Amino acid sequence: LQNQLGFSPTAYAYTFGAFSLLLPASNAINMRLVTRVPARVLLRWALLIDAAVALLLIPLALTGPSVALVPLLALLPAMSGFIGANATALAVEQIRDIGAGAGSGAMGFTQFVTAAVVAPLAVAASNYALGMALTSFACAVVALGGVVVVGRGSGRRR
């Protein structure tokens, strides 16, 4: 990806280091919003934005190095602050009947297995930006589908 963007190692490190700050920043914004907007609504919007951004990245990844990729790439970790916090809160609510420890363990296991499967897929192609965009889109769509299905089956609408 660094070569596709045409970044020096230093510029790449600073850019993605700055991106990493977007996750706690968006999480702080989420903490304020969740008092007024239901967590499920915030999660759905974050996943929709994540999927839309990934979809926009696909043609940009196909056309070669582009500075236009950078702001779109920044939106992915920004949405992670909303997705992680709200998905975890809603999941804990759904599984609290089996016990907090068991539920937390199951969630952690699932996250690590998913990361182990998804990470190689993102870099499987020679065009890393394309692989990342396709994988991000697929993950956002699957997650959104899960939120819709679980939300429909839940008696609790939050």
What are these language model-derived features?
Residues 137-158:
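Multi-pass alpha-helical transporter architecture, strongest
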